[in-house]
Amino acid sequence: MALGAGHAHACRDDGDDSVIDAPPPYESVAGASAGQFVVIDIDTPTDSPPPYSAGTSPVGLVSPASSGDGEVCERGRSRRAAWRAARRARRRAERRARRRSFGPGGLFVETPLFLPETMIGAHPGVGGDLPSGLPTYAEATSDRPPTYAMVMAACPTEPPGGSVGPADQPRVQSSRTWRPPLVNSRELYRAQRAARCASSSDTPQAPGWCGGTCRHAVFGVVAVVVVIILAFLWR
């Protein structure tokens, strides 16, 4: 305000004929908030919605302004839709029951399969050849292998034919099987040399006879040579 008033006075002092008025006074926020506000009503419902019902359909909702014939038609449509939904649900339940009633291999089972913490049971008269050591539902979901006792109980000990052929009989092996003796190469050489010496002479000799005779003969020859050399040197 002071700036605008000063500017007006300056213009008057300059001698200008046009008079410039001061700007309007500033209105604070408090003054603006005291005014009237426009409220827009968009017809927002404040009541809670009706409870959900599986038998009703959005098609069945009829405005009160509709005629009586239209109301009857809408009610008939909603009833037919509810009947169709009920028939579909019944058929789905029957299909699930049929799927549960057939066990592994297509055999009919009265009790439902894959019950938690229960063994898979079959009718006593149907599927009697099924293995009895099947794991439970919890063991199957946790992916734990069956124990050795369960596997042995499930596997049949005898073939279905009852008779075992000669080719199927297990070979009876004694615990004392023949094995070649562990012989040292030196001992083998001595045995072979003794066998050669024994085969060359008619009289049976001891195993060490061939070696001792050869040594004595060599010593005798050496002694004779030494004696001859000493005799020549003595003369």
UniProtKB/Swiss-Prot annotation:
Residue intervals passing through the bilayer: 214-234
Lineage: superkingdom: Viruses
Pfam families in the record: Herpes_UL56
Entry's localization field: Host Golgi apparatus membrane; Host cytoplasm
Region (Disordered): 1-27, 45-74
Motif (PPXY motif): 23-26, 49-52, 144-147
The record's note on its domains: Late-budding domains (L domains) are short sequence motifs essential for viral particle budding. They recruit proteins of the host ESCRT machinery (Endosomal Sorting Complex Required for Transport) or ESCRT-associated proteins. UL56 contains three L domains: the PPXY motifs which are involved in the interaction with ITCH, a member of the NEDD4 family.
Family: Belongs to the herpesviridae UL56 family.
Protein role: Plays a role in the transport and release of virions form the host cytoplasm to the extracellular space. Relocalizes host NEDD4, a cytosolic E3 ligase, to cytoplasmic vesicles.
Protein name, entry field: Protein UL56
Organism of this sequence: Human herpesvirus 2 (strain HG52) (HHV-2)
Name of the gene: UL56
